[in-house]
């Protein structure tokens, strides 16, 4: 993926706490990888309307089936959202 100002959404099914933690981890990882990114923490309900405007949506692997498979955004599912290495590996696959 070209290093433009990427729009990434950290989506959480249960409130905003987890998505905010993911957002912080994703911002750190993207900076380490040399990417510029605007990262938002959103609920699943808020994310549903943004599948065609975001570049990447990252969420729990259990939620990925809820997204439109034809969406513009690349959907990234992570089993352990607190594992920074797993998040980094998952993002690296779509960048």
Curated annotation (Swiss-Prot):
GO terms for biological process: phosphoenolpyruvate-dependent sugar phosphotransferase system. Transmembrane segments: none annotated. The modification Phosphocysteine is found at residue 12. This is Ascorbate-specific PTS system EIIB component. It comes from the Bacteria. InterPro entries: PTS_EIIB-like_sf (IPR036095), PTS_EIIB_2 (IPR013011), PTS_EIIB_2/3 (IPR003501). The PTS EIIB type-2 domain is phosphorylated by phospho-EIIA on a cysteinyl residue. Then, it transfers the phosphoryl group to the sugar substrate concomitantly with the sugar uptake processed by the PTS EIIC type-2 domain. SUPFAM superfamilies: PTS system IIB component-like (SSF52794). Its main location: cytoplasm.
């Amino acid at each position: 993926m070209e290093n433009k100002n990427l729009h990434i959404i950290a989506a959480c099914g249960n409130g905003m706490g987890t998505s905010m933690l993911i957002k912080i981890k994703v911002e750190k990882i993207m900076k380490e990888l040399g990417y510029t990114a605007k990262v938002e923490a959103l609920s699943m309900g808020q994310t549903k309307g943004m599948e065609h405007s975001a570049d990447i949506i990252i969420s729990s692997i259990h939620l990925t089936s809820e997204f439109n498979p034809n969406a513009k955004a690349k959907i990234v599912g992570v089993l352990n959202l607190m594992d920074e290495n797993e998040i980094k590996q998952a993002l690296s696959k779509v960048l």
